[in-house]
């Protein structure tokens, strides 16, 4: 069986225009998730969260291939970001940020494979983060665009979305700011990083 690449199979969700915002209807999708708070560049809990997510995701991928013959490319890392005061998020005061890092899990991967992957990863990494879980995310209607460049340079694009695009379309916030990381920051120069910026919305009326 061919290896499934969800960036291609779900191309409307894992691609976006660079200089405009596309409207997408995101179905309910299953993710393995870890919550945290603080500056991701300084907080060791962030690094541990990402390590756990990848360990689990690859363990589930290999188990799926072995047990059911269904192989797939591990989807990209994604993150939900917010702050109690929206100005702290827009102002890049990262020490006040909260986050949920996550990786999508295909529907055909059963919970038993997650539990087995959890046990395997625990042997390697020790006790998991308390917030580690497998659960669905229901975003529905969203606006998204492709940002190319440093994560710290997203501000003007988000300001345009919040202050121009959303009011013009008569919509308001219906969920947390969502980022999909298409590039590996360990191997990609900051100015070439590709990140999908997504915002769940609903009618403002």
Give the label of every model feature segment.
Residues 1-205:
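A solvent-exposed interaction/effector surface
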């Amino acid at each position: 069986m061919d290896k499934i690449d969800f960036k291609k199979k779900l191309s409307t969700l894992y691609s976006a225009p660079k200089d405009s915002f596309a409207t997408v209807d995101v179905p309910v999708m299953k993710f393995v998730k870890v919550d945290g708070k603080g500056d991701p560049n300084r907080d060791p809990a962030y690094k541990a969260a990402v390590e756990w997510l990848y360990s689990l995701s690859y363990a589930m991928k290999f188990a799926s291939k072995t047990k059911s013959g269904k192989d797939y490319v591990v989807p990209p890392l994604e993150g939900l970001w917010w702050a109690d005061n929206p100005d702290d998020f827009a102002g890049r005061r990262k020490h006040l940020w909260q986050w949920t890092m996550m990786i999508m899990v295909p529907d055909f991967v059963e919970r038993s494979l997650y539990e087995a992957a959890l046990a395997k990863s625990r042997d390697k990494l020790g006790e998991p983060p308390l917030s580690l879980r497998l659960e669905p995310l229901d975003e529905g209607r969203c606006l998204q665009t492709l940002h190319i460049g440093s994560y710290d340079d997203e501000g003007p694009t988000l300001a345009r979305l919040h202050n121009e695009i959303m009011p013009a379309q008569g919509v308001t916030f219906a969920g947390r700011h969502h980022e999909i990381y298409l590039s590996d920051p360990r191997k990609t120069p900051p100015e070439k990083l590709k990140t999908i910026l997504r915002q769940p919305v609903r009618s403002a009326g």
